[in-house]
Amino acid sequence: MALPSFITKIKSRVEYEFKKTLYRNLVFKGGGVRGIAYMGALEVLEETGLLDNIERVAGASAGAIAATLVSFRLSAHETKQLFLSLDITRVPQTIDNGKKNRLPLSEENACTRRFFDRYGWYSSMYFYRWMESIIGLQCDGNRRATFADFQTYGFRDLYIVAANISRQRTEVFSAETTPDVAVADAVRMSMSIPLFFEALQFDGTQFGAGDFYVDGGLYDNFPTHIFDKEQYANWAFRDNINWETLGLFLRQEQSLQDREPEIPGDVWQFLTLAARNLYHSHQMSAYQTNPVDKHRTVEISDCGISALEFDIEPGSERHKQLFDSGRQAVRDFFEIDSRRSPRKKIVETIKEHVQAP
């Protein structure tokens, strides 16, 4: 027998309030330029009150950028403004900032030299300087703030994933594991898409020596497992799974089978196409075979936009589509009725149905 409608609504409200207070850890999947969708998702998480309860954030690649911004404990609007201060069109840089060539080089020649000397076509220097400046704004001018410094400032605990290709393993940078590493350094490594951006040698203190690192998404683009330890849960820890973790996962709007075939016109286009397929196949395979993650993950449509479309500008239709996609995905996950305030308490629902004439 079906439950009375008001009981069904009360049950739904209880489940909603439970979810809102359950989550303590937030994980962002990598996604390139599509990270703007996370800003839309954050707005709704804030509206529900869920964002206030988050204690730890983690991410790889673009997810590492989002996680770092969220760690500052700013409002969703302030976080979005910081994100929008990054000029995405300048991120793939052909000429390094502050460096002059002895001989005049065309941009293509500079990229070719970088590709053979530093194993990547573009420089990530513009992004790196932007990340340092954002951190400096939040850390009293200290652009080189470390993970330990972030703890001192009372930020959310931050976990950044990068791929150490010298040792063929994922490395997690955090106050627990690498307290003295500058956060900007870790984020730069995490977003360095192999072959697209220069590979980075890092010795734990500075670039230019040590192991080679690239985009964290190469090995682990959706690191929800980081928090699958009892120490990161208050009570909802069962069978080595932390149910207090919520993931934000950018998924492809179209399957690869439904897309028009892409025919590369040169070696660089081929490498870009191969990298995109590698990331997609590896991460989707891992996600689809993990039923646990599906139950603790908000799936956000990428609106058919590639991770490497660096020509997206704020205010454009594609930019708005991604932002709205993030908002709607969170609403769908929590089954939020846009006509009702997400902050209504269950007692109001009871009064509405029980005391109605």
Regions found by a protein language model. Give the residues of each.
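Gly/Ala-rich beta-loop-alpha elbow adjacent to hydrolase catalytic centers
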Residues: 59, 63
